[in-house]
Amino acid sequence: MNENHYLLLTPGPLTTTKTVKEVMLYDWCTWDVEYNTMVQDVRNRLVSLATKEEEKYTTVLMQGSGTFSVEAVIGSVIPRKGKLLVCTNGAYGKRIVQMAEMLHIDVVVSQTEEWEPTNIAEVEQLLQQDKEITHIVVVHCETTTGIINPIVDVCKLGKKYGKVTLVDAMSSFGGIEIDIAELQIDFLISSANKCIQGVPGFGFVIANRDELLKCKGQARSLSLDLYDQWETMEEQNGKWRFTSPTHVVHAFYQALLELEEEGGVRARYNRYYSNQKLLVHKMKEMGFKPLVDEKYQSPIITSFIYPEAGFEFLQLYNELKRYGFVIYPGKISKVDTFRIGNIGDVHEDDINRLVDSIAKGVVIG
């Protein structure tokens, strides 16, 4: 049994290793040279994970949940006369639309059903029709359902039409290989508590240096000013403008070391992929059907359709919690689903124990 009181089968926060937890038992000063040097190391390691063309990119760390970092990008990168095209097929794409509207940014939406990927033909049509669009954003892994969106195609279109490209890779970065230089991504956003397997407390933005320099003075918020945050970290050896989550940063640094020890992003992807395939195979044997078509399914989290009208998710949830597992309810409106994640410190034995527990906790048919 895992040392945790529960194994979190969620898309983040997730189950972390004992060693990641242990580094949070100590206290650190935000002004300490050793701490700030470590912050710089974290920033450099993130760029190295993101691309081989490291000199073109830089990292900004931002306090708060991943959503704070997304809003920092939306509010800092798009100028007053800019216009944003949002590709959405889930809650997190919709949240970006909400942000843009709250910040009085002109926004155009390309929306597909939650179980269907971004419609590339529609995106191109919108780019052809609306010459005022300056920026385009897509969510890579939409954890509303677990679907993977075609960021390669979206980014190609963005560059074909001369747009600044933003990718919300919150639940994919560190777990799925991405080279932001190859894809010509200008701003990629993720969080400490996802595939790198840290804990919640900050997000990060890996940015094209040339595009980031254009953001000076554009921010619509003091605390979420992406350029000012970067400039302070760059000029003052890793210093944050405001109090940083020191324990979380140390845990994240440890998580980065453990990602490297595992064999890097490809090795972690292989583990997640194997977990997800095993999970789906076993769940199908019990009569559960995945919502998303296999060719669009991510290795991060899987949505399962309720097997029958009388199925009680809460009953299954409570039963699994009794066995030491926590899963997620569904998040879409048109189909009754629940979700099971397989990222974090989760392995084949854990998946086998989970499905055995599900078999005990629910009767289908």
UniProtKB/Swiss-Prot annotation:
Needed co-factor(s): pyridoxal 5'-phosphate
Record-level Gene Ontology MF annotations: 2-aminoethylphosphonate-pyruvate transaminase activity
Single biological process term from Gene Ontology: organic phosphonate catabolic process
The protein's name: 2-aminoethylphosphonate--pyruvate transaminase
Main enzyme class: transferase
A Pfam family hit: Aminotran_5
PANTHER family, alphabetized: 2-AMINOETHYLPHOSPHONATE--PYRUVATE TRANSAMINASE (PTHR42778:SF1)
Lineage summary: Bacteria, Bacillati, Bacillota, Bacilli, Bacillales
Keywords of the record: Aminotransferase, Pyridoxal phosphate, Pyruvate, Transferase
Superkingdom field: Bacteria
